[in-house]
A protein has these predicted regions:
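Conserved acetyl-CoA-binding loop-helix of GNAT-fold acetyltransferases
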Residues: 77, 83-96, 123
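Conserved GNAT acetyl-CoA-binding A-motif
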Residues: 98-113
C-alpha cells in the first residue's frame, strides 16, 4: 500500500491515538489529551496535513496560510517510520497541494524544534530544497 497525504478535518478515535504516538516526543503530555488533539485537528486558523500508511497515521505537519505564504509547524514523523522517505513524501505532496492553491512561499521556524532534533531536521529540510537562514527554513514554490 502507498503513502497517502490528506488534511485531517474529521476527528476519529484512531486519529487521536495515532497523533498521541506521532507527537509523543514533541508535545508535553498535557497537549496529548483527546481534547487538545481534537482542538489541533479542528482549529480554523490552520490545517493539519497527515500522512498515512496501512491505515495508520504516521506523520503530521500543521500549516497556516497567509496570502501566498504557508507557514509550517509541528512537523514530525513517527519514530518507527523515520528515514524511509515518509517526511519527504509528506512535504512533496503538501507543496504540490499548496502550489495548486497559489502559494508561492513556505517557511518553517526551526526554533520550535527540540535541540536534539535540530541538526537532523536542518539536514532533512536542506535535502528537501529548503534554504536555511537564522533558524528559518524557506522554499520558493514553482
Amino acid at each position: 500500500m502507498r503513502l497517502s497525504v490528506f488534511i485531517a478535518n474529521t476527528v476519529s478515535t484512531q486519529l487521536v491515538i495515532d497523533l498521541q504516538k506521532i507527537y509523543a516526543s514533541y508535545f508535553p503530555e498535557a497537549s496529548l489529551t483527546e481534547q487538545a488533539l481534537t482542538e489541533l485537528i479542528t482549529q480554523s486558523s490552520s490545517r493539519l496535513y497527515m500522512t498515512m500508511f496501512n491505515e495508520r497515521h504516521i506523520g503530521a505537519v500543521n500549516v497556516q496560510i497567509n496570502a501566498t505564504q504557508a507557514t509550517l509547524s509541528q512537523l514530525t514523523i513517527r519514530d518507527l517510520t523515520r528515514r524511509r522517505g515518509v517526511g519527504k513524501n509528506l512535504l512533496k505532496q503538501l507543496e504540490k497541494s499548496l502550489t495548486a492553491e497559489g502559494m508561492t512561499d513556505i517557511e518553517y521556524n526551526l526554533k520550535e524544534v527540540a535541540e536534539v532534533e535540530l541538526l537532523a531536521t536542518q539536514a532533512f529540510l536542506s535535502d528537501s530544497g529548503y534554504q536555511l537562514n537564522n533558524h528559518i527554513a524557506t522554499k520558493k514554490l514553482l
